[in-house]
Amino acid sequence: MIRTPRSNSYEDYWKEFKDIASSTDGENEEEEITKTPDEGEEEISWLKEAGYDFVVNYITGGRELTDEEIQGFTATLTTSQAAVVRRRVNTLSATIRSKQKHKVDVRDIFPQPPDNQSPRSPVPQTTSDGIDDINLSAVPRRHTDKRLPSLYRGRGEYSMSGRGNEVFKDPEESGIETLSVQQTGTFNKHMVPDPPDDMRRSVMTAMPSISDEDIELCIEETAPKNSMQNAGLEKEDNLPNFNIVPDRLGVTMVTDLSLEDMKQIKSLALIELTALFERHHIIYHRRKGKKKGRDHGIFGVPLHTLIEQDQKIRPNQTVPMVFEDMAKFMEHHCLEQEGILRIPGSASRIKQLRKDLEDKFYSGTFSWVNVLPHDAAALLKQFLRELPHPLLTHEYIEAFAQVENIQDKKQQLLVLNLLILLLPPVNRNTLKMLLELLLKITQKRRTNLMGLSNVSMIMAPNLFLSPSSRSKTKGVREMEISMAAGTSNIVMMLIKYQDILWTVPSVLIQQMRHQNELEMQKKNREKSIMKFLRKDKADVYKKPAVINEGDFEEGVIRVLAPSLTKSCAAVKLTDNTTAGDVVDKFRNTNFTNGRNKKKDNNVQGVANFAEKDARLYEVGGNIGERRLDPATNMLALYQLNPNAEWVIRSESMD
């Protein structure tokens, strides 16, 4: 007779919660006090995380941004994304003005609607008949009137990355055209004024425009299949099945992009997440934890502290070593244990194991040989819930919980995807390792009686109940218990859809490319900024030239493989050439193993060919670095990024 997992009820959740409460000794519990943010503090924090440090510096310095300037640095955003940025800029500007009590502004007496208005000059301008000047916000975004005056005053530092400064002087001299500021990207060094409207339209056409409707995950719902059981998931979860839709430009995973590119993607993800929540009328609070945690040891130590000390031992470590050891032990010895995660281990043994880990782990003398499965599971859960800063972070743990309030399943997945992108790398990597372990546990459900629902309900309180919920503050405890009670579905989605959630939406990559192209154009204009005074400025605004124009016209790419015998080759692309096809040209078709001792007629010694794990990388041009999906259509990508370099690398040789 086939045994099945326990019924889908909240019994497992409440039992786990009681076990958590009873296992907390309270001796070292530190009360977390939620401080009400100072006026304007939330807007400053949000704008900085969204990449607009220069805007914060400009406004807090007592200056004003015109509508044209705001439209300039939000030009690469969708309408809803730009509106989100504008509202926060307007709110911060109004807050700063209100703090300057010695100076009363008419806008503080007659405030403008926040959704479609923006700050103007400190002194309201009127025409001779007393009628207010034209409302700048009525000018369509990306198509501002070049005749409108700019209101730069004094000095302003403009750099999206914060690495460059440019002084803008007041354009008082007659005949000098006033220009706006565009948002910068990762490659920005300096900011320079923008071209006039007609020129701006020409450079904007380098990439297709992006609408609000384009921001979505490329997934499609599929009918239930018997293969679901092979994935470890049954229809008991009541969740639809989704597949990733192939993309001509390749599906991009989080780990495929460089760290610099991910910083840019993170800024875009925050803006889009905020726009989505506002569209669904959902409010969440970005908390800041006050609990510092220990600066050494295992339990109660922040993840960033653990990974910093671990990388001194293993430079390429991406998750805390102790958590990796726990997960690997459970994967090898605990998956088939009945009631794993649900049945508690021995309190006395767990206490001793904790002490042994603290004392022996980093000296290399701790042994997992005699550790029992349920004790190991208890250690892993204790490690997670005792983190002084939650795995899902103080800033976004409430946002994760709020996903349940969105009705559309695809929209839920998009929000979860954006939240994953917003996590710090160590949190995101640790969460992925945890979810992979939990999925493997559900794949053995007929043996361990732990289906997806059971695992999710048990893990929800360990992920969503912060240490403050176990403090003496009853109000805080009841609030977080209420919040966590509805989070088992969120954990279920994280487990089931993890492959989808760790992709980077193609539209965000498109926006990043767009920003970087504008930055390259600004760099070119920087070298000849005095040409702005000439009557004919067409040469200043022309698009960056294709470096190898002959190759581009013929559809030929130059592929570099510095670690292989054939270190460089020209590859002619066809409509069907994929990134995998390009790598195959560097493999030895006579051998299954990439590295072999076959003598080459042209090269003396050992011939190195591409290994099985070799991948093609897109480097430079309008992106930092991206590891390509083998199914990427190379001709389509080449046309999008003609100035990129193409490099083959093997993970085993890095």
What does each of the following model-derived ranges do?
Residues 1-369, 457, 461-546, 653:
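Intrinsically disordered regulatory linkers and targeting segments
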Residues 329-377, 381-423, 467:
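Alpha-helical cores of eukaryotic small-GTPase signaling modules
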Residues 340-347, 370, 393-403, 438, ...:
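Short amphipathic alpha-helical segments embedded in low-complexity Lys/Glu-rich regions
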Residues 347, 357, 553-564, 577:
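PDZ domains - specifically the beta-sandwich core and the conserved carboxylate-binding loop
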Residues 396-397, 409-486:
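Alpha-helical bundle/repeat cores within regulatory domains of eukaryotic proteins
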Residues 564-581:
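Short, contiguous acidic and Ser/Thr-rich linear segments
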Residues 605-608, 612-654:
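Eukaryotic mixed-charge, acidic/polar low-complexity intrinsically disordered regions
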